[in-house]
Amino acid sequence: MNNNTNSNHNDIAPEATITQNTTTSVSNDELQHITNNNNVNVQSYVGPTDSVESSSNTADEENEINSFNAQNVKDYEANVGGELPPDDELSRIESNTELSRRATRSIMNTESLLRTASQSSKPLPPMGGGKEYPPMLGSRDPYVVAFDGPDDPDHPHNYPTWKKILYCASVGLAALSVSMGSAMFSQASADIMQIYHIGWTPATLTTSLFVFGFASGPVIYGPLSELFGRKLVMVPSCLGYVCFSFAVATAKDIQTIMICRFFAGFIGAAPLVVAPAVMADMFNNRYRGTAIAIFSMLLFGGPMLAPILGAFTVKNSALGWRWTSYFCGIIGSLALFMNTFLLQETHHPLILTRRAEELRRRTGNWGIYAPHEELKLSMKEIVENNIARPLKMLFTEPILFLVSLYNAFIYGMLYLFLTAIPLIFLGEYHFVQGVAELPYLAMLIGILIGGGMIMLFEKRYIKAMEDNGGKIIPEKRLEPMMVGGFTFVIGIFWLGWTGNYPQHVHWIVPVIGAAFVGNGLMLIFLPCFNYIIDCYLLYAATALAGNTFIRSAFGAVFPLFARQMFTNLTIKWASTLLGCIGILLLPMPFVFYYYGKSLRHKSKFAFVLE
């Protein structure tokens, strides 16, 4: 049995008949639900949870799971009368008991679980009291709880705007606090070196351990949030982040700092996966892409703002380096308060489960149930679905490996600049600490512009999809990357070669180059996820799990060698090296744009539209 993700809830809809051979084929009409369902965009930061593939499934079982077909929708529309809005397939599925039950079992592979249970040789436990086993219920369908149509006020898509904004603010603040925590402590490295008599690399490890923790944490939190709900995962995560942040601030030795930094990142990582899922729970396809793009800008903005706040904090003699963690803990405490007292559960299956519980209590009919109550999760499944198969897929799928490599390089560059910017403006231009970190604002501006450009490209993508008969076009996701690759390379050379000559070049010139770098980072990073999701669809979560592993490795390692590289090679030549790597990766989106479809034809996991 597989654990599931929010992506999977929407990727398998009644209108899709998808068979898995060498290539997964989807007919034009059957794909409409997929093109309408951009819920998979949450995987940009949701990271890995599962796929509908089961390592123990036979080919027949997989076909049975994936054959949740369009006839169900036709029957439903015939019974209800008229079509439901095409942009709300999830509401349509969940508002019909039969579709809801079958969707949940298909997505979570519950059918194979039930078959395994029925075939078990283990004897049933007795009823007790000498009673015989009661007779089986007839049809279970009348007992399945579902939403009362797509306009059900309990469905998160129908929440009032103020409630959606409040919930987004709650989970968004939690995500911002964690992303800031990844970078703010980097400004304390010099003080850490002096106080604990360690070198630069061990001091930088405090940042790398945090990044590795909060980049790999979603491997666990994704499936947990799908099984137990968003809030039940968010609150303990926020609490753990606050506790370990304060533990870092009060630590007496470097070992405690290292350990607590890792656990602050790992335990506090839930907002990175749950926050986009909450947004996807509440927004339909018309607004979901915008919400996720804004969240992406927020997540990238945290590491840009954090060094500025951290530098001025460390510089202030009344505060000092410990307050970089105190501030993170305080912001995290506010997020903890909001998520504890203001956030309510938005995960659709959990809402139905609670409705079923209330109906059982108030009616006394204990046969009433929600499909989600049939599910369970084991550590074995987490390991298989989120570690073993993603790694296998990463190294056997050329599209996934190369795009993930580009994505990981960009992610590593984000944290490499925590060292590069101060070296240029503190070391070359002799700005004081705090002021030397202000150029991060230029990178932030570039990121915000990049986010706006992605929204414009999203409109182009939707129009191209409509012109193509409503069929999804994965290669169209690469257009922002084509632009971002050039702006990133231009920015790297601009920043490095102008920043190396402070006696001849005004400081504003490399600052402008930093804005180009930020713009390129955003234009490359988010479209990489969307392209992977569109290419692998049913296996998107597994593909993104593999992406997360390589991305977290790059994010953790890059800060460790950044200072030595920029010091030994000088700023201009270190930037040249990075720029040349960017040039080598530059053709990738163009190659996949023109040849991606033929590569997908040869893939065991990707799908091709027929």
Curated annotation (Swiss-Prot):
Its main location: membrane. PROSITE patterns: MFS. One of its GO terms (molecular function) is transmembrane transporter activity. One of its GO terms (cellular component) is plasma membrane. SUPFAM superfamilies: MFS general substrate transporter. InterPro entries: MFS (IPR011701), MFS_dom (IPR020846), MFS_trans_sf (IPR036259). This is Major facilitator superfamily multidrug transporter FLU1. The gene is FLU1.
